[in-house]
């Protein structure tokens, strides 16, 4: 027996040869590490000190029994831990609880907006009026109105561009809002907006849900009346603009006489100007000279009344009053020529009498004949008399 004890003391691992593998329990050091570190089981229980001098053979039985009980306890704890562990195929949280927010997705159809995020039942004019009336100075800039609406109604924190455009249109196209420019004392960007002094009764008893009536400024009404009044004036102005056209119509009725007058001037040269008042009005020729001139210049049988009418039109032409006083002026040269040409024209009258009987012929032939007669008349005058009278001042021009 002592030899056996000594053998145990020398080599404690020889116990394995005495028991089968099925009868040997694993020590507590082989237990699962999943147990907490502060477990009630000691880690060095398997190493039982056997080198005590008082140990006898009777103590070996209790030691082995204790070690066997501890081994069975370790196997029980390992089995319990294995049964509590979830299977590898199933997820740890099958219901989806306690997961991260990134993995959780809420169905948008089941989501209902809170009452605070719902659209307010106020119009844009009501919102602007509320913002301005709650301001300390009863005026706000456009950005201040935007900020006031966003702070009070969370619904307008989304789609800001849409409703901000509507706010601007409401401010511009309603007479109840007045734009006030900034004063030099308060520099900044943007003008102020305030309520019209006469627009206090737009809402019933301060209820902004519905307007009582649409406010219109009296000034705008008067402007519309002025526009309506100015419309008939524009029509009258159009009729006044059409009056020159009527004047052209009247002048066109006289157009048949215009070629006759122009033809008379072209065919006679400067003699019409002499007879019709090329000189001042006081130097007009006598009626007899006018009659003889009419026979010479108009052999087609024009009446004296028609000719005098044409002459009367030329009398009213504007002439230079100082043109007759200069010795080399055209009027004096033509007046000096007039004194010499008229006697020769009287002498030429018998030669042109035969042209009167052929009044049915074309006017071109008679105008050509009368023009040739005048050319012969001017060529027959001597140059000595012409130059002698050119430098002398006529008696009539001095009047």
Swiss-Prot record:
Q: Which residues bind DNA?
A: 119-213
InterPro entries found in the cross-reference section: Fork-head_N, Fork_head_dom, Forkhead_box_C, FOX_domain-containing, TF_fork_head_CS_1, TF_fork_head_CS_2, WH-like_DNA-bd_sf, WH_DNA-bd_sf
Q: What PROSITE patterns is this protein classified in?
A: FORK_HEAD_1 (PS00657), FORK_HEAD_2 (PS00658), FORK_HEAD_3 (PS50039)
Bias (Basic and acidic residues) ranges: 219-234
Q: What does this protein do?
A: Transcriptional repressor involved in embryonic nervous system development. Plays a role in the induction and patterning of the anterior-posterior neural axis. Involved in the establishment of floor plate differentiation from neural plate cells during gastrulation. Binds the anf1 promoter sequence to restrict expression of anf1 to the anterior of the neural plate, thereby patterning the forebrain. Can bind to the HNF-3-alpha DNA target sequence. Cooperates with t/bra in a dose-dependent manner to specify dorsal mesoderm formation, including notochord.
List GO BP terms, alphabetically: cell differentiation; negative regulation of DNA-templated transcription; nervous system development
Does the keyword Repressor belong to this entry?
yes
Q: Which Gene3D superfamilies match?
A: Winged helix-like DNA-binding domain superfamily/Winged helix DNA-binding domain (1.10.10.10)
Q: Which GO terms describe its cellular component?
A: nucleus
Compartments, as annotated in UniProt: Nucleus
The ranges of region (Disordered) come to: 219-290
UniProt main location, coarse: nucleus
Q: This protein's superkingdom?
A: Eukaryota
Name used for this protein in its record: Forkhead box protein A4
**Which species is this record about?**
Xenopus tropicalis (Western clawed frog)
What SUPFAM superfamilies does UniProt report for this protein, alphabetically?
Winged helix' DNA-binding domain (SSF46785)
User: Using the chain's own numbering, where are the disulfide bonds?
Assistant: none
**Comp. bias intervals (Polar residues):** 267-277
**A UniProt-annotated Pfam family:** HNF_C
A GO molecular function assigned to this protein is: DNA-binding transcription factor activity
**PANTHER family named in the record:** FORKHEAD BOX PROTEIN, FORKHEAD BOX PROTEIN A4
- Determine if Methyltransferase is one of this entry's keywords: no
This protein's UniProt keywords = Developmental protein, Differentiation, DNA-binding, Neurogenesis, Nucleus, Repressor, Transcription, Transcription regulation
């Amino acid at each position: 027996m002592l030899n056996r004890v000594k053998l145990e003391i020398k080599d404690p691992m020889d116990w394995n040869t005495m028991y089968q593998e099925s009868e040997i329990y694993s020590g507590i050091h082989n237990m699962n590490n999943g147990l907490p570190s502060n477990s009630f089981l000691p880690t060095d229980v398997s190493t039982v000190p056997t080198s005590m001098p008082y140990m006898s053979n009777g103590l070996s039985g209790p030691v082995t029994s204790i070690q066997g009980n501890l081994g069975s306890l370790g196997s029980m704890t390992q089995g319990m831990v294995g049964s509590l562990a979830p299977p590898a195929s199933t997820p740890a949280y099958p219901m989806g609880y306690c997961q991260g927010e990134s993995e959780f997705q809420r169905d948008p159809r089941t989501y209902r907006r809170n009452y605070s995020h719902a659209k307010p039942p106020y119009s844009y004019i009501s919102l602007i009026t509320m913002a301005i009336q709650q301001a300390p100075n009863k005026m706000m800039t456009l950005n201040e109105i935007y900020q006031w609406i966003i702070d009070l109604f969370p619904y307008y924190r989304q789609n800001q561009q849409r409703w901000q455009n509507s706010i601007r249109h409401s401010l511009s196209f309603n007479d109840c809002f007045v734009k006030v420019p900034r004063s030099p004392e308060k520099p900044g960007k943007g003008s102020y907006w305030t309520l019209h002094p006469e627009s206090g009764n737009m809402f019933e008893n301060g209820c902004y849900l519905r307007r009582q009536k649409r406010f219109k400024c009296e000034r705008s009404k008067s402007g519309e009346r002025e526009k309506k009044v100015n419309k008939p004036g524009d029509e009258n102005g159009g009729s006044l603009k059409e009056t020159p056209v009527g004047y052209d119509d009247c002048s066109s009725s006289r157009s048949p006489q215009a070629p006759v007058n122009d033809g008379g001037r072209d065919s006679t040269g400067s003699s019409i100007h002499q007879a019709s008042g090329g000189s001042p009005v006081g130097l007009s020729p006598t009626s007899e000279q006018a009659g003889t001139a009419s026979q010479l210049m108009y052999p087609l049988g024009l009446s004296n009344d028609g000719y005098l009418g044409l002459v009367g039109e030329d009398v009213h032409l504007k002439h230079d009053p100082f043109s007759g006083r200069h010795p080399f002026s055209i009027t004096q040269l033509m007046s000096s020529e007039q004194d010499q040409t008229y006697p020769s024209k009287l002498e030429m009258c018998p030669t042109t009498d035969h042209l009167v009987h052929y009044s049915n012929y074309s006017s071109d032939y008679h105008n050509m004949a009368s023009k040739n007669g005048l050319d012969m008349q001017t060529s027959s005058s001597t140059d000595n008399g012409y130059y002698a009278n050119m430098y002398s001042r006529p008696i009539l021009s001095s009047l």
